From Swiss-Prot:
Protein name as annotated: UDP-glycosyltransferase 72E3
Taxonomic source organism: Arabidopsis thaliana
Top EC group: transferase
Catalytic residues in the record: H18, D111
Family: Belongs to the UDP-glycosyltransferase family.
SUPFAM superfamilies: UDP-Glycosyltransferase/glycogen phosphorylase (SSF53756)
Gene name of the encoded protein: UGT72E3
Length: 481
């Protein structure tokens, strides 16, 4: 039987930060482009993934057992190294699952750490695509940095000169990902290995849109600029992020938000994997209090070490007014008329969408950034790790929709925090940022438009046509045999 409906198999790295954008892409391919989609996820993420797909047809979830890597990698290895080993060890099981299907998928879509699965394409006769859930700036640096000669690398890493990238804004030394600054460490070689594999696919999908990153996308698509390194089509398919869920608005924070004036509340969250030291938490609390602005703070215990962690254990008790011990004594009492504290987790997208929210102090993870833009909310950029410094530079220097901390690796004083908060929430500069981000929000909505020929929709239409042509060729070969 000749198969006419394209079938995409998607292979996601572990962790919901990786899985959720993959799920949103799967839903888009199924609902708007006629794909049947099979998403392969590790068992640790399976339950959460199923809950995100309750109302989605045309998308199947296949669980893969989580490989035991305890004897394969140092327990203290970088998270990039650990994820890469997990994905590599899962490839044989992925292959078995695909081979067991009645018909091989038309295309295999991997994310940034799934490059070991590219070898399956030739064997099983599939197209392959790399999905970068981050942005075009990240993609550009990722594919360009490994091609640099040692002299240029030394100018950047030793002499701390900005990294010049064809057709793009230069990247400051302070903004480059830490992994690129340690060429003798395993994490550097692991990251470079993945990045060098991206151009081996048939195309690269990136979670951005033309108006968000015009220079980087133009360079990636120009064969005289970064396109000569990418070597394959680069498709902007964003913004892809979790949709707002009306069912989550029964959280008590919304009762409080409903009583606040429009655009008067600053939302503060460093994401599920970000943390501050005890000293920095104290300075942040004092800065918020002295700013005299309304706020919602998703506050977690301090971690005096790396700013990157997956989980946080409860630490310390509370004082008599329920102020956590790691915050200034009496903080909750003194700010109770204008502040709302949330431990651990909050319905972020729904909070940002509320009319009372007028600013977002964020770690600049790409998903959080997209949620803020889609809600028309300007930001205070406080990056912590990975590509977040580059994201912060994009938001503040290129787009003008955020203010930015001077150096997130140094302690930020309460006076600087107060000034940033007031700038976004109470001064003319904040109003200008708000105007710009709302305009950018409108372009994001246009990008997603099905009937208006939005750039994201058109990009996926091109991918769909490529898959359909491939299906026709496979069918012709089958009939010829």
């Amino acid at each position: 039987m000749h198969i006419t409906k394209p079938h995409a198999a998607m292979f996601s790295s572990p962790g919901m930060g990786h899985v959720l954008p993959v799920i949103e892409l799967a839903k888009r391919l199924s609902a708007n482009h006629g794909f049947h989609v099979t998403v392969f996820v590790l068992e640790t993420d399976a339950a959460s993934v199923q809950s995100k797909l309750l109302n989605s047809t045309g998308v199947d979830i296949v669980n893969l057992p989580s490989p035991d890597i305890s004897g394969l990698v140092d327990p203290n290895a970088h998270v990039v190294t650990k994820i890469g080993v997990i994905m590599r060890e899962a490839v044989p099981t992925l292959r078995s699952k695909i081979v067991a299907m009645h018909q091989n998928p038309t295309a295999l879509i991997i994310d940034l750490f799934g490059t070991d699965a590219l070898c399956l394409a030739a064997e099983l006769n599939m197209l392959t695509y790399v999905f970068i859930a981050s942005n075009a700036r990240y993609l550009g640096v990722s594919i360009y940095y490994p091609t640099l000669d040692e002299v240029i690398k030394e100018e950047h890493t030793v002499q701390r000169k900005p990294l010049t990238i064809p057709g793009c804004e230069p990247v400051r030394f302070e903004d480059i990902m830490d992994a690129y600054l340690v060429p003798d460490e395993p994490v550097y070689h692991d990251l470079v290995r993945h990045c060098l594999a991206y151009p081996k696919a048939d195309g690269i999908l990136v979670n951005t849109w033309e108006e968000m990153e015009p220079k980087s996308l133009k360079s990636l698509q120009d064969p005289k600029l970064l396109g000569r390194v990418a070597r394959v089509p680069v498709y902007p398919v964003g913004p892809l992020c979790r949709p707002i869920q009306s069912s989550t608005t029964d959280h008590p924070v919304f009762d409080w938000l409903n009583k606040q004036p429009n655009e008067s509340v600053l939302y503060i969250s460093f994401g599920s994997g970000g943390s501050l030291t005890a000293q920095q938490l104290t300075e942040l609390a004092w800065g918020l209090e002295e700013s005299q602005q309304r706020f919602i703070w998703v506050v977690r215990p301090p971690v005096d070490g790396s700013s990157c962690s997956d989980y946080f254990s409860a630490k310390g008790g509370v004082t008599k007014d329920n102020t956590p011990e790691y915050l200034p004594e009496g903080f909750v009492t003194r700010t109770c008329d204008r502040g709302f504290m949330i431990p651990s987790w909050a319905p972020q997208a729904e909070i940002l969408a509320h009319q009372a929210v007028g600013g977002f102090l964020t770690h600049c993870g790409w998903s959080s950034t997209l949620e803020s833009v889609l809600c028309g909310v300007p930001m205070i950029a406080w990056p912590l790790f990975a590509e977040q410094n580059m994201n912060a530079a994009l938001l503040s220097d290129e787009l003008g929709i955020s203010v930015r901390v001077d150096d997130p690796k140094e302690a930020i004083s309460r006076s600087k925090i107060e000034a940033m908060v007031r700038k976004v929430m109470a001064e003319d500069e904040g109003e200008e940022m708000r105007r710009k981000v709302k305009k950018l929000r409108d372009t994001a909505e246009m990008s997603l438009s099905i009937h208006g020929g939005g750039s994201a929709h058109e990009s996926l239409c091109r991918v769909t046509k490529e898959c359909q042509r491939f299906l026709e060729c496979v069918g012709d070969l089958g009939r010829g045999a």
